[in-house]
């Protein structure tokens, strides 16, 4: 959200899919220790939300000889965020909610149905959690979109 969309100034961690997994984790731990980052600053939790229709882009992302950066397309990222639907206890805008609102606005989706239809493009209907539908419907009902 920070690098690919400029949606906010900073993030507490970097979500990535990387290989070789253990080698990258070991190096990330060493880098984190030397820079004073929290444990888990680089994580691969996003791999649990990878769709068989895995759509990425490298547009506007820096590229290096030794590192290839890609990001999910906005549509795919919105679907992933809806699948996760992590809602913070402390703040109404915690976790995925702020990102979901940003992406819905970015994509100019006019209704909760449009959002959920988009999610269904990437994930089978029987895998989409009902909390995602309730969250998205609530955002529209509250006028946050």
How would you label these PLM feature ranges?
Residues 1-145:
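Compositionally biased terminal segments of proteins
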